């Protein structure tokens, strides 16, 4: 636990040192959540803004909605976007997250290669190659990703894919890192779904 705290602290310090202005200027995300009320009518439950923060990595991120069971149930008025989770959802859970990938820095590139894998910790699948980049990690999830704006490179074990706005990715518990080699942030929407061990 101490190592995890140190890693998170290092990532936060890097973020504060190198990306504070960008993070403060990151636009909020409008979130609209609906439900069916007691009368059977569809209504808006929440219409608010999600603040993107840099608590988990140098990249501002905000959790839209989190579920913790399957089959899914409904929140009955609770704000499941405020549920605390780590990088991935819990067992039988889902996670809807927005991330702004900021342009990479030399400090990020020089972090130990296992930095992000240590953050993921027990949520990482057992199978997989060692990381080749400090932000490389894998989670025991199937991830749906939609690039909303900007461009980003998805690094895999021995290859990479350049992605632009409108591109989508389905990731099945594979090693990956998101690296923005451009000059503008890249916004990506992610839905992570808990999966079996690959």
Language-model region placement:
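Positively charged n-region of N-terminal signal peptides that target proteins for export
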Residues: 1-5
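Bacterial N-terminal signal peptides
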Residues: 6-18
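Boundary at the C-terminal end of the N-terminal hydrophobic targeting segment
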Residues: 20-23
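Double-stranded beta-helix
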Residues: 25, 30-32, 36-37, 42-46, ...
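Conserved short histidine dyad/triad with adjacent acidic residue
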Residues: 49-51, 97-139, 172-175, 194-196
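Ligand-binding loop in jelly-roll beta-barrel domains
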Residues: 94, 151-153, 160-165, 173-197
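A short beta-strand-loop-beta hairpin characteristic of the jelly-roll/cupin
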Residues: 130-133, 137-139, 144-165
């Amino acid at each position: 636990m101490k190592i995890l705290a140190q890693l998170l602290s290092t990532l936060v310090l890097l973020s504060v040192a190198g990306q504070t202005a960008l993070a403060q200027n990151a636009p909020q995300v409008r979130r609209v959540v609906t439900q069916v009320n007691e009368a059977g009518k569809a209504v808006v439950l929440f219409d608010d803004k999600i603040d993107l923060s840099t608590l988990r990595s140098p990249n501002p991120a905000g959790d839209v909605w989190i579920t913790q069971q399957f089959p899914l149930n409904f929140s009955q008025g609770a704000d499941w976007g405020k549920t605390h989770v780590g990088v991935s959802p819990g067992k039988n859970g889902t996670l809807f997250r927005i991330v702004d990938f900021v342009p990479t820095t030399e400090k990020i590139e020089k972090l130990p290669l296992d930095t992000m894998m240590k953050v993921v910790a027990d949520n990482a699948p057992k199978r997989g190659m060692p990381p080749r980049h400090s932000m490389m990690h894998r989670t025991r999830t199937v991830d749906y990703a939609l690039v909303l704006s900007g461009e980003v490179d998805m690094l895999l074990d021995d290859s990479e894919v350049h992605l632009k706005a409108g591109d989508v990715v389905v990731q099945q518990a594979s090693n990956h890192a998101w690296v923005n080699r451009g000059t503008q942030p890249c916004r990506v929407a992610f839905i992570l779904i808990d999966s079996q061990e690959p």
